């Protein structure tokens, strides 16, 4: 029944509008991630990259899942995206509020051969890359705040969470988590 589907969407935090005489509709700013669109954009702008892309409607944490994939020998460059996280995490174990289809929740698996010492400054390098991308997309006044925050116009836009697994003195894998508050609802 339609009401079960509506309840399932509401359970994800998506407000469904009832339009008398017409039915139901999602909010106007509703847009889901598209694997085909993302892969086409990557191919057009960077050529074919040897990466794997996984998109979830809902997941507990993209970083947790990416970590599991890395422990199962995922290829370097594996990207995990989600429309919703039920247990998103920020730095120092803080909760990362992750409403459905409102923001960007992404984790990247990346392998390094030189160990933890060679990773000094990685958080800053990732932040610079995110900032550069946002500026290329037309955003202005994008700033980085040490150690992992991204701001626009003095307001927090997102954050970066790095987690390392493997040998601190040799081959290791870093899970690079990036969360961006694209369309954060005012109640979140």
Predicted regions and their residues:
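Solvent-exposed beta-strand sheet faces enriched in polar/charged residues
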Residues: 17-19, 145, 163
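Long, positively charged amphipathic alpha-helical accessory segments at protein N-termini or as interdomain linkers
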Residues: 1, 7, 11-12, 114-142, ...
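N-terminal lobe of the biotin/lipoate ligase/transferase fold
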Residues: 3-136
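Hydrophobic residue at the +6 position relative to the catalytic HRD Asp in the kinase catalytic loop
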Residues: 24, 149-151
């Amino acid at each position: 029944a339609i009401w079960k589907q509506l309840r399932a969407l509401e359970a994800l935090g998506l407000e469904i509008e009832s339009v008398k005489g017409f039915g139901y509709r999602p909010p106007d700013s509703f847009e889901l991630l598209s694997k085909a669109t993302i892969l086409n954009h990557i191919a057009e702008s960077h050529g074919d990259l040897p990466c794997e892309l996984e998109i979830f409607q809902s997941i507990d944490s993209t970083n947790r899942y990416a970590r599991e994939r890395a422990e199962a020998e995922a290829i370097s460059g594996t990207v995990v995206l989600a429309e919703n996280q039920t247990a998103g995490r920020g730095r120092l174990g803080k909760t990362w509020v992750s409403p459905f289809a409102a923001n960007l929740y992404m984790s990247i698996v990346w392998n390094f051969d030189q160990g933890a010492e060679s990773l000094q400054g990685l958080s800053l390098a990732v932040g610079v890359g995110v900032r550069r991308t946002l500026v290329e997309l037309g955003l202005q006044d994008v700033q980085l705040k040490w150690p992992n925050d991204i701001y626009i116009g003095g307001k927090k836009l997102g954050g970066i969470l790095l987690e390392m697994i493997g040998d601190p003195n040799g081959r290791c894998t870093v899970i690079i988590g990036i969360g961006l508050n694209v369309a954060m609802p005012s109640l979140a």
